[in-house]
Amino acid sequence: GNTYSANNKQQTDIEQLMPKYNSTFAKMNGNYSYKLIWDDSMVSDALQEAKEQYSTNATFKIRRRKVFIKGDNATMEEKVEGALKYPVLRADKFLRRLLWFTHYACNGYYDTKGGHDVLTVACLYREIDYKNSHY
């Protein structure tokens, strides 16, 4: 018999965090909002970074993987905040040194496939040299 039939819903076990948790990422970077500009064009790069494909070009990066037990009833917002809180705090002196108008984006994914749930998040910060950019 085919054991996969009825239970094999066409639903993925991996949830991408953007765009749904954009405001959560912005909140976690809130101390630096005076100098940072969210850049939608970097969102897919941030996902690649979370997936450990390190080709992304960025001035500074934060990446964190956090494991949750199945049935953890924290909201996804709480999980994302919990995952980013300490990496952002630890990065404070680097984030403060970033140039004004640094572009940034975060992304990640929540994977429920294995015995535990795994949240992986990444934020990329890219300094933009406006002196040499032509519009």
From Swiss-Prot:
Keywords: Glycoprotein, Secreted, Signal. GO terms for cellular component: extracellular region. It is found in: Secreted. Residues 1-5 form the signal peptide. Glycans are attached at residues 22, 31, 57, 73. To H.contortus 15 kDa excretory/secretory protein. This is 30 kDa antigenic glycoprotein.
